[in-house]
């Protein structure tokens, strides 16, 4: 979500800025932990990883407060939409820009991410389809169960299996 959207309150904008900040810190701290391990500094890597974990908790709390954590099916719909945008628009544009600026390192990074986004879209879409099928089957089963019920002769308000 863009934080420059005019209909956001200051608090909503601040929540989004905090979410982005926590996500960036998480990524950086994990990257720094990997570098510390490469340099033979596991104790420093552990510090980076512990703080990265705390940043995750902060970010998740901000997401919750911002109302972004919904039902699993809604979350799957949200991420498939996001992955579709990344795969279809964001990364292709970034690749073109990097090519125009002769930044092969960025082209490679964006291209790899684009391929992974395709995979992410596939697995999220599959999970969404499976959940929708399960919910449809569950709904049909509930309807079928109700259709197979008849009113008890003793009381019109009590259902019994036929």
Label every PLM stretch briefly.
Residues 1-162:
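Non-heme di-metal
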